[in-house]
């Protein structure tokens, strides 16, 4: 019997009748390209570089009808649809549209959205019925499409992660709801891969042990088997299948991780070039950590060689941190340890932060002119972390790099 972990309701959920609306923009990057180039509508559109060894960033639903999916290699996508049209990624433009959409929703419907990524966000309502939540979701969905020409799918639940799962079930351009009391009927029949955190990397092991539906995870009471199949996060996955939350001994909700990876176009990078690329990827991930107002306790670095063999190293710190130099130093140490044992050329570099925790607002933060660039959500940052975030915000506001650290200047 399972008796090694505890279910609980997080402090912010206790004695509160909350319902979450989880917003997920449909094929967002492709939708923005279609919005700005109407001639691309109804054409098989792939966002990515046609002549690179990278992967499909996203694609529209016409391209998906050919079997093309996000994360698929460009070569495979071209095999499936030789006449596909390609658009280069323009992340600054996608962020601009994302900010506008979320801002319009907030101002029009007088609600606060917690923006989770460029194309995902969640709003929380207290003391309303599922029927009322559905009507609100329908109004938002239709308003955004009619006024901004972007399609969104919305999941509704009294459990945050179940709302996320059902936003995916609602695609494209739909609304799906599932209350915790209805999980046996609505959640359990779904494929187990619908639970966030169960990816393709371990799916063979999952299927081999007869976990196909969420129901299979929910009813399993063999803790040793669950740990073998799902690893260190099995308690959290199990809790989601039961519509509950999981806490460790420190009474903290186990958080999702942040990850960024990049497929290299040149397979002949020197170690010095690879370390520079690592720093660029790290900077992207660090910015996400800062914007989410969280600290992390663990880092994973992953390398994929040109023969598609994947290796990784991880480090779990004693204390939570958002210190730029400390996290970068650990990341580089893990990376170079991997390089020593990698005989083939490097094809992909990935970094993830895990075991995340929210940080409180620092009311004593300096209020100088430069600190106005720092979003109010950023809190209790170390001086080093604040400086790096400040540099990013200033450069972002001007549209190009006008400020950089002295140690990054060429001699």
From Swiss-Prot:
Listed SUPFAM superfamilies: DNA/RNA polymerases (SSF56672), Lesion bypass DNA polymerase (Y-family), little finger domain (SSF100879)
GO MF terms, alphabetically ordered: damaged DNA binding; DNA-directed DNA polymerase activity
Single biological process term from Gene Ontology: SOS response
UniProt domain UmuC: residue ranges: 20-199
Signal peptide residues on this chain, from the entry's feature table: none
Cross-referenced InterPro entries: DNA/RNA_pol_sf, DNA_pol_Y-fam_lit_finger_sf, DNA_pol_Y-fam_little_finger, DNA_polymerase-Y, DNApol_IV, PolY_HhH_motif, Rev_trsase/Diguanyl_cyclase, UmuC
PANTHER family the UniProt entry points to: DNA POLYMERASE KAPPA, DNA REPAIR POLYMERASE UMUC / TRANSFERASE FAMILY MEMBER
Family: Belongs to the DNA polymerase type-Y family.
UniProt protein name: Uncharacterized protein MG360
Lineage summary: Bacteria, Bacillati, Mycoplasmatota, Mycoplasmoidales, Mycoplasmoidaceae
């Amino acid at each position: 019997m399972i008796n090694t972990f505890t279910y609980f309701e997080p402090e912010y959920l206790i004695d509160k009748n909350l319902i979450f609306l989880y917003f997920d923009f449909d094929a967002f990057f492709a939708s923005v390209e279609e919005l700005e180039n109407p001639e691309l509508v109804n054409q098989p559109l792939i966002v990515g570089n046609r002549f690179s060894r990278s992967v499909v960033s996203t694609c529209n639903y016409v391209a998906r009808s050919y079997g093309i999916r996000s994360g698929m290699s460009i070569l495979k996508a071209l095999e499936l649809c030789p006449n596909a049209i390609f658009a280069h990624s323009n992340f600054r433009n996608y962020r601009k549209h994302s900010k506008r959409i979320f801002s319009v929703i907030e101002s029009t419907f007088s609600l606060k959205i917690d923006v989770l990524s460029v194309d995902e966000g969640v709003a929380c309502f207290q003391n309303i019925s599922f029927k009322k939540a559905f009507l609100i979701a329908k109004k938002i969905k239709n308003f955004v499409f009619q006024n901004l020409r972007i399609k969104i799918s919305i999941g509704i639940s009294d459990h945050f992660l179940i709302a996320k799962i059902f936003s995916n079930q609602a695609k494209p351009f739909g609304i799906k709801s599932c209350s915790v009391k209805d999980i046996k009927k609505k959640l359990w029949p779904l494929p187990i891969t619908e639970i966030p955190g169960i990816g393709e990397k371990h799916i063979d092991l999952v299927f081999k042990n007869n976990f196909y539906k969420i129901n299979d995870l929910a009813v399993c009471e063999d803790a040793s088997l669950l740990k073998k199949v799902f690893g260190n996060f099995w308690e959290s996955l199990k809790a989601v299948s039961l519509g509950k939350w999981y806490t460790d001994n420190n009474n903290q909700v186990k958080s999702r991780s942040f990850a960024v990876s990049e497929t290299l176009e040149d397979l002949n990078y020197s170690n010095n070039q690879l370390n520079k690329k690592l720093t660029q990827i790290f900077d992207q991930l660090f910015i996400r950590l800062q914007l989410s107002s969280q600290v992390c306790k663990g880092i994973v670095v992953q390398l994929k060689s040109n023969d598609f063999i994947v290796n990784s190293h991880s480090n779990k710190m004693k204390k939570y941190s958002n210190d730029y130099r400390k996290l970068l130093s650990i990341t580089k140490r893990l990376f170079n340890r991997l390089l020593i044992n990698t005989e083939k050329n490097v094809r992909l570099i990935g970094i993830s932060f895990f075991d995340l925790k929210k940080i409180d607002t620092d009311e004593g933060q300096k209020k100088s002119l430069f600190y106005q660039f720092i979003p109010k959500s950023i809190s209790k940052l170390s001086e080093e972390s604040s400086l790096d975030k400040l540099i990013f915000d200033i450069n972002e506001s001007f549209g190009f790099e006008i400020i950089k650290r002295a140690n990054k200047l060429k001699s």
